[in-house]
Amino acid sequence: MIDTHTHLYSEEFDNDRAAVIARAKAAGVTHCFIPAIDSIYTDRMFALKNDYPDYVFLMNGLHPCNVKENYKEELAHVENLMPTHHFCAIGEIGIDLYWDKTFLKEQQEAFAWQIQLAKKHKLPIVIHCREAFEEVFEVLESEKGDDLFGIFHCFTGTEEQAHRAIGYGLHLGIGGVVTFKNGKLDQFLKNIDLQHLVLETDSPYLAPVPYRRKRNESAYIVQVMQKLSDIYALPESEIERITNVNATKIFQL
């Protein structure tokens, strides 16, 4: 299995990171893809890569929740990092209006700029969207093309929004929310071809049932796979195979 989205550098793993990674490997997780947040976490990400060079793969980008007054400095940091490392994607990037709409204009500008950066380097994007589907789609519409591809991380939208995202060349990142009773994804996901899905945890956040409200970790991706096996009425091995192929293509492994 491939965990396409995990914050393994998070402080929440500082006391037992090696054990968390050992459990992930024991569960069958072969690759962990690591989204960027902002410049504060850069050193932690590179330290993680140094410790697990063949297991973790780093993205570069500015998280929409961290688009503040200094966002242009942060974007310059992102650009300056590009020659220093082989990044697997630009992410996580997007728009988040859940807590605050103060910086919507700046979030839109940062999102579009980072999409263009990804295109320049022929990299996928990994999108963060919260309470902002229309705003995200507006930017994607302006940037659409054959060179736009990637993952709509932690997809929690409707079936119609799923098809719109796929229409822009994106795969849907499916994580713990699919196991929630109120998650609603299970009501329509079987209408979406598996070739458009990848697995993720977003750990340490959004742990799947039966670990909900506890710290999430990559090993719990098994519960996501099991839920998809139920939804699609396919063996877990087939869910794993197809989503692995999808992730491998996106990240050009």
Where does each model-flagged region fall?
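Mid-domain alpha/beta scaffold segments of enzyme catalytic cores
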Residues: 1-253
